[in-house]
């Protein structure tokens, strides 16, 4: 079991029930809120204790249902799982401070694939770091944070 932060950043309302049922199968109950960045969609953030295999299963289910999400898993091997309907799933290893880690074996593979081209190496590193996923998920994150930071009227 590991501390797991599940943030369904954007899910079509038509998929919310199925995602909710999938979460309930892990004894998790989402509190759906509108996603201000995209009309007709919802979001939810849930803290959980889940095994690695359950996190993998959940992320595969959510991507099939068209959700954009991120799951931070603080297990013996911390990771960040990013999901976007247009890009699919991306699993990133994290260090103790939450920074993305590219392991030596991965780096060696990237160097070989780049074939001596600096621009190709830079492109491959961006893919390995999940830059495209992070860029596409950021507007949902920011929209959610802006809404929660608005002052309440008295």
Q: Language-model segments: which ranges?
A:
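Short glycine-rich, basic-tinged beta-strand/loop micro-motifs
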Residues: 1, 36-47
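Short, extreme N-terminal segment that most often corresponds to the first beta-strand
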Residues: 1-32
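Hydrophobic beta-strand residues in large extracellular and virion-surface proteins
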Residues: 6-8, 19, 23, 44-46, ...
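Generic alpha-helix signal with a bias toward terminal, lower-confidence helices
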Residues: 20-22, 35, 58, 81
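Short, exposed beta-strand/loop patches in secreted or surface proteins that constitute
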Residues: 30-38, 62
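Charged interaction segments
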Residues: 46-154
């Amino acid at each position: 079991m590991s501390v797991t932060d599940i943030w369904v950043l954007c899910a079509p309302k038509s998929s919310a029930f199925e995602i909710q049922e999938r979460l309930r199968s892990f004894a998790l109950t989402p509190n759906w809120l509108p996603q201000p960045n995209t009309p007709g969609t919802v979001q939810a953030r849930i803290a959980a204790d889940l095994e690695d295999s359950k996190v993998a299963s959940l992320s595969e289910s959510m991507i099939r249902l068209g959700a954009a999400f991120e799951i931070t898993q603080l297990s013996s091997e911390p990771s960040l799982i990013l999901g976007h309907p247009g890009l699919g799933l991306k699993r990133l290893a994290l260090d103790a401070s939450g920074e993305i880690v590219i392991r030596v074996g991965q780096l060696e593979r990237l160097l070989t694939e780049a074939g001596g081209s600096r621009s190709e190496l830079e492109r491959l590193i961006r893919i390995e770091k999940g830059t495209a996923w992070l860029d596409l998920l950021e507007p949902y994150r920011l929209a959610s944070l802006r809404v929660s930071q608005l002052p309440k009227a008295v």
